[in-house]
């Protein structure tokens, strides 16, 4: 019997071990929700479930066929419809579970290992699922109901971190296991708290407790919904970014980067006036602008001429006060100017169009300014006023020449010789005499000149043109100075001498002597003629002389013109005739007077 008992003993031991393992798996798979609150240290009664004895001998074993497929019978269980335990039973189970921490940790580890297969539901809720198809425990279904939104977000972030991790080595697995164990502990603690609260406040039916739990969840979900209006806040922030305004100018930018770029380029390099907002590159320009109070005209320091813009002052200083050069030339006549704007104005002179017409006289002009100056002749307006003496002038150059009276010298003065000029044109021509510059060349002989008028004057020597006629004799001259000299000579011969309107002509008697022969030359003076044969003088009577230039003299040695003082406050009258006919007419007048004297002499003799 001993020989037969030993092999039977060897057969029983592995079966018992296998039965214990099967029983543990069965306990894990077939754990109903109420058994979750029992102590994990309870021993399994395998005498009734695993095997049974047929006889009194301890080695007779009969294996139960139902142990092979325990999970097929567990599917019929419905954990949600079992009767709930009393409150006292829950407290006792809780105390038993606290006393058995070691066994609970082992079960949690094994239980969590089975959950690695499925962790997230379609609703993004964490589920504690076993290996079987319907092995979902009641705890796992109740736990997500009691979770808050913040805790769910934490778990989701942890799950995302675990899903995105690409380290599938041993270290990664260990970390996953540790995290899963922590999750299980957290969920168990939450279920304990929920069970204690539900047992104290709920009715015996589980459905009502569930309904209350769902009603308790609603404010939590509302809290989460309250967090959703983050989008309008972000939109408001975007709006704030879109309305970034510059502090120094009214420009608006979408991003801060563009605003900083605008500040660096515009405001940190440019100088801006605080009053009117004008920009200046240099601080000196800004200070000059502020001295004019942003509205007054900018004046030149040298000549007190006012300008509206600063660049106009710069151009004026270059051109007028003598450190600029004429670099821009006309393509047609090669005339040079200081600026290109002056060249454009000059190009109008080469066109034939004259669109500006005077309404009064019908004269046409090429420029509007020329028409405006011309219209002053008809209106008699004098728009240019002297600020010192309030005298007004019709043209601007007249005012400039007048200002030399107040200044003490003319506006443009040569620094080399001290000669001053009223016109800039004359000043420029004079300055070329010092520099030796002669840019104007005659096309015929190649001679050069300092100014264009001088070249035109020289060209008349080649063309024979004589544009200056004499008003008295009609003779024409090539130059104006020649006409001036001719007028002085011509008027010296024909210049009248003023006499009183009534001239007394005494006809005195002369001694009886043979009268000298009258010269036939027109310039010889006529001798005195005795009008009375008796020798008595005729009574004096006023005779209005029709010719103011004719005088009769009694003495033969007197010259033709007597030094008669002119009449004060009266201008000399113009000459009526030329010199030669006047002398011939003088002879005819002498004969006419003699004839009158002869007629009157017999009547006077009879009277006496």
Curated annotation (Swiss-Prot):
Residues covered by region (Disordered): 60-234, 540-589
Pro residues: compositionally biased ranges: 563-575
Modified residues (Phosphothreonine): 103
Cellular compartments annotated: Nucleus
Coiled coil region boundaries: none
Biased composition (Acidic residues): 98-108, 151-162
Any Gene Ontology biological process: regulation of transcription by RNA polymerase II
Recorded GO CC terms: nucleus
Predominant localisation class: nucleus
UniProt keyword annotations, A-Z: DNA-binding, Metal-binding, Nucleus, Phosphoprotein, Repeat, Repressor, Transcription, Transcription regulation, Zinc, Zinc-finger
Subunit organization: Interacts with CBFA2T3.
Protein name as catalogued: Zinc finger protein 652
């Amino acid at each position: 019997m001993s020989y037969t008992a030993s092999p039977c003993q060897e057969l029983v031991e592995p079966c018992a071990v296998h039965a214990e393992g099967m029983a543990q798996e069965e306990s894990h798979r077939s754990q109903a929700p109420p058994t979750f609150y029992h102590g994990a240290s309870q021993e399994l009664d395998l005498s009734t479930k695993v095997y049974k004895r047929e006889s009194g001998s301890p080695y007779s074993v009969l294996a139960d066929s139902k142990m092979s497929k325990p999970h097929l019978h567990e599917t019929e269980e419905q954990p949600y419809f079992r009767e709930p335990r009393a409150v006292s039973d829950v407290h006792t189970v809780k105390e038993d579970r606290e006393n058995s921490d070691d066994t609970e940790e082992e079960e949690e580890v094994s239980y969590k290992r089975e959950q690695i297969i499925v962790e997230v539901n379609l609703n993004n809720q964490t589920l504690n699922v076993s290996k079987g198809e319907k092995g979902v425990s009641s705890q796992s279904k109740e736990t997500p109901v009691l979770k808050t939104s913040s805790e769910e977000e934490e778990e989701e972030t942890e799950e995302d971190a675990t899903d995105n991790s690409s380290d599938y080595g041993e270290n990664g697995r260990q970390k996953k296991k540790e995290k899963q164990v922590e999750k299980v502990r957290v969920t168990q603690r939450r279920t304990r708290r929920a069970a204690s609260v539900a047992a104290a406040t709920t009715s015996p039916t589980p459905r009502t407790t569930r309904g209350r739990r769902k009603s308790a969840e609603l404010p939590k979900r509302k809290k989460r919904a309250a967090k959703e209006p983050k989008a309008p806040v972000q939109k408001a922030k975007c709006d704030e970014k879109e309305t970034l305004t510059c502090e120094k100018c009214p420009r608006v930018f979408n991003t801060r980067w563009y605003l900083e770029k605008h500040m660096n380029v515009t405001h940190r390099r440019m100088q801006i006036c605080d009053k009117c907002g004008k920009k200046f590159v240099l601080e000196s320009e800004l200070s000059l602008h502020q001295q004019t109070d942003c509205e007054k005209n900018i004046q030149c320091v040298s000549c007190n001429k006012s300008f509206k813009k600063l660049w106009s002052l710069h151009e004026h200083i270059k051109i007028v006060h003598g450190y600029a050069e004429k670099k821009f030339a006309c393509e047609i006549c090669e005339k040079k100017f200081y600026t290109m704007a002056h060249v454009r104005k000059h190009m109008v002179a080469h066109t034939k169009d004259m669109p500006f017409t005077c309404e009064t006289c019908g004269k046409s002009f090429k420029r509007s300014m020329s028409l405006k100056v011309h219209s002053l002749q008809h209106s008699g307006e004098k728009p240019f006023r002297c600020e010192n003496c309030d005298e007004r002038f019709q043209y601007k150059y007249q005012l400039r020449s007048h200002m030399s009276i107040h200044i003490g010298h003319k506006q443009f003065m040569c620094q080399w010789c001290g000669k001053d000029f009223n016109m800039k044109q004359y000043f420029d021509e004079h300055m070329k005499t010092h520099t030796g510059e002669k840019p104007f060349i005659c096309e015929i002989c190649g001679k050069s000149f300092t100014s264009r008028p001088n070249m035109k004057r020289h060209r008349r020597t080649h063309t024979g043109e004589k544009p200056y006629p004499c008003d008295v004799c009609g003779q024409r001259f090539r130059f104006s100075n020649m006409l001036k000299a001719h007028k002085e000579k011509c008027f010296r011969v024909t210049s009248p001498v003023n006499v009183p309107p009534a001239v007394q002509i005494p006809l005195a008697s002369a001694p009886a002597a043979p009268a000298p022969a009258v010269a036939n030359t027109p310039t010889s003076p006529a001798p005195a003629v005795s009008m009375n044969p008796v020798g008595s003088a005729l009574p004096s009577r006023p005779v209005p002389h029709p010719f103011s230039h004719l005088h009769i003299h009694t003495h033969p040695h007197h010259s033709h013109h007597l030094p008669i003082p002119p009449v004060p406050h009266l201008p000399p009258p113009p000459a009526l005739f030329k010199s030669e006919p006047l002398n011939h007419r003088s002879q005819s007048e002498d004969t006419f007077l003699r004839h009158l004297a002869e007629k009157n002499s017999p009547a006077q003799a009879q009277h006496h």
